[in-house]
Amino acid sequence: AHAAWKDAESDFIGILRMWNALQPFRDERGKWRRNALRKFSTASYLNMRRVIEWSNVVDELADAESAHLKRGSGKDAAEIAYPYASIHRSLLAGVPRQFGLWDRENKAYRSASGGFFAVFPGSGLFAAPKRWEWVVAMELVETSRLWARRMARIDPEWVEQVAPHLCRSVYGEARWDEAQGAVYGKERVVCGGLAVVMGRRVHYGRVDAKLAHGVFVREGLLGGGLRKRGKFLDFIDELREEVGTIEDKLRRPAGVWDEDAVVAYCEERIPQEV
């Protein structure tokens, strides 16, 4: 009887569908038509008393929201179009550690703590045509194995948005970008044992100014990555040519010129703000 409300992406959308299916059994004042509700509940294997208790909680929350925001309750819940992302970011904020990444080898979801959990057979996601890569689980119940109940597909970047205090960033691959005239790198955001953001492009000067300055000198200034050449670079080229001539005479190719020393010389004299 509940199969009509199930959703392959989210058990919470299934709950919302159930709620919306109950709304026609209210009168124009919002009161329940109990006889009709009782028949529907019996046919749908729902507990009418629990339905009414659920309704009371929803009404109390709506009143509290209206009082807090100092506005009317607005549209009836059944009339509102609920954005998937907004609903599930809110749910994820309540259980920010209870998310997982599908592990094909183990055929289960790897959790942020390093363990594994499986989709509970009663979930709408159990019979879904595909396994969603990332999910949140509102309930984790351990019996013969750790089962996830009340699940939903999520975007891993939502973890960083709702729980930045649980995330840490790892940076690398700093490179000079000639088109942008700056040093850029890659950011990886990790929560627990799972990377929720991979390869996000970042301005490296805001991450590690000293390292970015070194990349600028080596790749941008001395590596020919600048759009405009200054007289200083002409001097360096002339000096490199002169040293090359000396190396040829001494039969010591690349034995006199020290690129690292030149880089260190430039780093010492060019301010990091440049």
Task: Describe each PLM feature range.
Residues 1-182, 210, 214, 236-264, ...:
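Second RecA-like catalytic domain
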